[in-house]
């Protein structure tokens, strides 16, 4: 067992010291400061999470694909142990911490570990107009019947885009936001995405409401 080298990280903007962290591949994208509840049932992840709770340390969430894992992710810390089961399974609440690029993956333990390079945004302030537009579209999103929006956003968060995007279902899109080093760039991506996503969802909801009818808002003849 050894070390698998992944694609080299994109080294620009603010780069922070690297380190070795445990990895938890999942079909989910988590952002800094956003909550992520998890049910832990595999033995290897019981060990990993148990160590994180004991040491109050972080582990990395990376997007799992059929062909492997993404080359960027976000660490989380266990904020609360919600339930411990007799067989060692756990329900936990975690919260996103720091973003990272994967430099190398190490498989010497039962769970993956990786040498990572942490990064953050550049220091440029986000455009107030972009923020206002994104918040407006977020409120339109929250008004949809199928919305899973997370309540009122914290307008003082310098990375507001993460809050506004966390309930969206498109994991590839969320992964692209996670990797972006500019809040302006994320807000532009988010505004463009929502400008297409919201009308599409409205159309879907309207079609669902018409499905039991004859297409004109009334019941078919004979029913």
Question: Model-derived features: where do they sit?
Answer:
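Intrinsic disorder/low-complexity segments
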Residues: 1-11
